[in-house]
Regions:
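Gram-positive cell-envelope targeting signals
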Residues: 1-30
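Extended active-site neighborhood of metal-dependent phosphoesterases/phosphodiesterases
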Residues: 100-188, 193-194, 221-228, 244-279, ...
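Short acidic, glycine-rich surface-loop motifs adjacent to enzyme active sites
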Residues: 190-212
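Beta-strand-rich modules
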Residues: 407-425
Length: 427
């Protein structure tokens, strides 16, 4: 398919997505402030969730170091808490770059050297686990996975009374249709056991039309299956789309959470110009904590700066309650506000080693951090540079933007910077 034509289709779907959630999300209500975490919230379960590690097999690869840090940083965090358990790590697919044996060797090595007693590592297969073999026999992907990880490509595990269900692609590395009946059966077992508690499901692609990235990196069979189970909290990757973005959580008939990537987070500003890497190094994973009543706390961890994001935290009480949708697309959009710069904000100008001009300015923030900035540089009435750039909201430690606008002749210029939120509020 022609790439331009595909982008047009994605843009049309994105528009339909916006209309769909603009109506559907009203069912859960709007203008509802998400609840604060109760002071007496006491976890009985703690687990980390990541995806898209894309190990190359090289020990000094940044992704390998981040996957290692996921274990060690979480153990360090748990040691400071009243509940000190670190019960599980979920890897929602694409732990390898292409499903090659040296990549699995590195995956297993990191787990063997860093995963301590009492922590389970739960894994499902992503599309990259089949890439090396697709041209002649994709089913080999299963054989290699079973050799290094587990004989079971689909799993149902109970940890501290909570159900975890992991679903891999079929052996073609592309579809889930053949997995639907198994998934339904396992969900029914989990609901029969714990009808009023969250059931954690993970697979590689997003359920279609749920979270950020689910327009063009998704699977419809997964979506239609999960719709019947309000207890489900689903974790998915594939798109690499920024997990720090509020659109990466969405409550409809079930709860969906996008996992971003331990490689590089990505963004897509309009579904026409295509996916873009976020500026600089970016990587993140979720830390989930659950109490005895089934209330869930999600906190996002920056795997590059080794710290939690200050404002990316979601407390979800009564997950199975169909009427409680604080994190629906419609509600989050309704409480969003246009980002503003600090009152004393200024733009400073510097020159890089190539002689190109760099604009430096502080981050803008509304209810959520700015997602992008629309920047125009003018010489008199003439526009000499104009672009929309992704913000650095994919990093927990950065407070200032640095935007290269190329080589400019000496003279006076007028710079206009308009920040926009993830829900396109601003200007």
């Amino acid at each position: 398919m022609n790439i331009y034509f595909r982008r047009i289709i994605n843009a049309v779907i994105a528009s339909a997505f916006t209309c769909y959630f603009g109506v559907y999300s009203l069912v859960g209500g709007v203008n509802k402030q998400p609840p604060e975490v109760p002071e007496d919230f006491t976890p009985v379960l703690r687990f980390a969730v990541c995806s898209d590690v894309h190990l190359s097999g090289e020990e000094d690869q940044a992704n390998a170091k981040r996957f290692t840090a996921l274990y060690n940083d979480t153990y360090d965090y748990a040691a400071t808490q009243s509940y000190k358990g670190f019960d599980a790590v979920i890897v929602a697919g694409d732990m390898t770059g292409g499903g090659r044996e040296p990549e699995y060797v590195m995956f297993k090595k990191i787990i063997d050297e860093n995963c301590r007693e009492g922590t389970r590592t739960l894994v499902c297969m992503g599309n990259h686990e089949f890439i090396e073999y697709r041209d002649y026999d994709a089913t080999i992907g299963y054989d290699v996975y079973k050799k290094f990880v587990s004989e079971d490509v689909d799993t149902h595990t109970v940890i501290n009374g909570y159900h975890f269900i992991g679903v891999s692609y079929a052996d073609d590395g592309k579809t889930f249709k053949s997995k639907v009946e198994w998934l339904k059966a396992e969900l029914d077992k989990a609901v029969a056991d714990t009808p009023d508690k969250p059931i954690f499901v993970f697979q590689h692609p997003h359920p279609t039309l749920t979270v950020y990235g689910s327009v063009n990196w998704s699977d419809l069979d997964i979506k239609t299956t999960l719709m019947k189970y309000p207890q489900v909290v689903d974790f998915s990757g594939h798109s690499h789309y920024a997990s720090c973005d509020p659109r990466s959580i969405n409550q409809t008939s079930f709860t969906s959470v996008g996992t971003g990537s331990l490689g590089a987070l990505m963004s897509n500003l309009d579904y026409i110009s295509g996916d873009v890497d976020m500026p600089g190094e970016t990587a993140a994973f979720w830390l989930a904590e659950v109490d005895a009543e089934g209330n869930l706390l999600l906190k996002l961890y920056d795997a590059v700066s080794h710290r939690f994001f200050d404002d990316v935290q979601y407390y979800i009480p009564n997950v199975a309650n169909k009427g409680t949708k604080y994190y629906s697309w419609g509600n989050l959009r309704s409480i969003d506000t246009a980002p503003q710069f600090p009152q004393d904000a200024k733009v400073s100008v510097s020159t890089d080693s190539e002689g190109e001009t760099v604009l430096n300015f502080p981050n803008a923030k509304g209810y959520f951090d700015a997602e992008n900035y629309r920047i125009t540089v003018k010489s008199g009435a003439k526009t000499v540079w104009s672009d929309t750039v992704v913000s650095n909201y994919g990093r927990a430690d950065l407070t200032e933007m640095a935007v290269n606008v190329g080589k400019l002749d000496k003279g006076e210029y007028t710079v206009t910077i308009a920040p926009y939120s993830p829900y396109s509020k601003g200007g």
